[in-house]
């Protein structure tokens, strides 16, 4: 450490308010799972060592020592537990930033998830949110972190009791890396016991590629550092030598999750490009799963050396896949920029995607409850592939699951086609914001009355992909919000003797009153209980138009079509008014806004709608 650094004074900093809340959440909500603190600290040490090794590929000055390891030293006499590594280390500013602040949104999301999670699921949230370091305060009254950045001669000690503040003090460390010293609480003595520590390491960190040593005290009082983990790359072993428990432990290690993997894929590819892959399909959904910014974090290794988890080894709609791909066909010093352009990676990506797709398809055909649960968790993102992955769109459509008006069970498109009525040439669907809203939509009335099944699509991407898929098994996909004459081809299965009003004069009267607010006004057979509905005449359906407007995309004005039900009492009454020569102008806008409300559309003038409705209701109320 330089003389300049030793002359610097200690600094006191306040935790950000978010860290204070986070510490309280972690310490109190996860108390019964305190052993995970060691898993998180060891995982952080391994990540730091991986990072230094990678950076040393392009800067030899950062090279790791030959005996690089993660060292765990319990000291019962001092009630201290030390975890040391030879990793990349942290600067003064990185210590303050990484250990003293956290994004406000991250804290809030973490708290919400923690409160909602079952007790057995809470530990997994620590790793998923990247806040594992703070788990140390479950077992320690004070935590000291001494770190020296690789390539620097300065070291600093970050210290805190987790009660609102931390200090940064100049320190000394002979080599780059980090030492974390936990000053243990009185009720945490078990974590100073070598046997207990070894069992935790075996449970959570046995397959970390770096050697983990544990300092043992012999009977004569001397100490010895002994190997505590196997340190063998699990994926390099034959499948016959790996137990399901070992697969599950490795999955939990690499994913920071606690669920059991839904499926495990372990294979070696040989040919033009050779690689070994160990991949997992999760059974539980991560907290940030639906974020578009989230990417797959499959680890790419070259000859067992971690290179990156940003290689995009599967398309974004497969971002739930976890695991490792290891190859000898790439150079160790390949840059991340060059990596994306290499044909080797392109071949690996294609092979991995094909294998994962095949596994999902195979399990879908088994049609067990396990797949339906998997689909409920991950189907919303898999359907992104219907929108963005032209190469695999048809295969995805073959195993995709959907809700429909037929029953509460999930169905496939093949199920739908097998039940199509004679003369039906299209697959009907309705998109919207929620399944409950779709089930009660006025758009379905005429289809239900004629026994025509309709797919109910309520995920965000459902507003987009039907346009790209366009057809399945030569059957076009058709939104029920499009104005079309399909319903007139089918007789109603429900007896309806209600007489329809003559709306020949009402239709043009409403159209004149509404002007360019609508494209047209039409009498319809699609309604059985509602008075009105809005539809579109080709182009994007109503939901897609709404999504495009929300996202700020420029789009031409697309006035809706207002369809009226000639059998509804309100429409009959308005038809009588027109026949008597009375105006329906005040009613026209209310009818259009009523149809918009039914469809979940925003009203252009909510105040005006309220006033008009109140005025119209005042007449009958006064009688």
UniProtKB/Swiss-Prot annotation:
One Pfam family of this chain: HSP90
Subunit-structure text: Homodimer.
Record's function text: Molecular chaperone. Has ATPase activity.
Location of the region described as A in the Swiss-Prot/TrEMBL record: 1-336
Entry keyword annotation includes Cell membrane: no
GO molecular function annotation: ATP binding; ATP hydrolysis activity; ATP-dependent protein folding chaperone; unfolded protein binding
Region: B, residue numbers: 337-546
Keywords, in A-Z order: ATP-binding, Chaperone, Cytoplasm, Nucleotide-binding, Stress response
PROSITE patterns to which the protein is assigned, alphabetical: HSP90
Gene Ontology CC annotation, any one: cytoplasm
InterPro entries xrefs: HATPase_C_sf, Heat_shock_protein_90_CS, HSP90_C, Hsp90_fam, Hsp90_N, Ribosomal_Su5_D2-typ_SF
Taxonomic placement: Bacteria, Pseudomonadati, Pseudomonadota, Alphaproteobacteria, Acetobacterales
Protein name: Chaperone protein HtpG
Species, as recorded: Gluconobacter oxydans (strain 621H)
